[in-house]
């Protein structure tokens, strides 16, 4: 879809479009004085990388998941950036022989605890049943992309060094205390690379990644807040 709007009303229209959670908007601006006018790519705005054009001030997380499996048991590296504040989170979860879907359940909970508007899903094993994972995480209800970028350790270290301004004798991954969570470091590298490709300004305010402390939360599933009449439903 191509559209043009008066410059004075750009923010209003763009906020409404992004709020639909369906579209990635490419902003083409022009510079110069007619007839010597040139057009250039200014910004790429997607649901997860939007922080300038918002209808409310709620958190807006873009999330990256790296999914692996061992003998049918799922392992997930999770990372997320709240583009409104620059806060960065990560965790790595492994399933068990008793519950092979445990890791998927955990990241599903993470995405419900932290308002998630866009997701990049990467698969470490080509034999993973991708449809099973996407359906289990109910990603058809969100904006998501299948990622194919698999950054090497050397790339991750250099990327983190530049983004987080790390000056240390340790590797960047060690400095961030993430050497024991390789799925999470790769997930975070994929996420940062994606964000830079959309709007590099977001990276300038990025804080050091924090391990997600799930012990601070209780997850209320199955629309529990609505069922308990804590919040109103749209049809009430």
Please name every model-derived segment.
Residues 1-236:
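Charged catalytic and DNA/RNA-contacting regions of genome-maintenance
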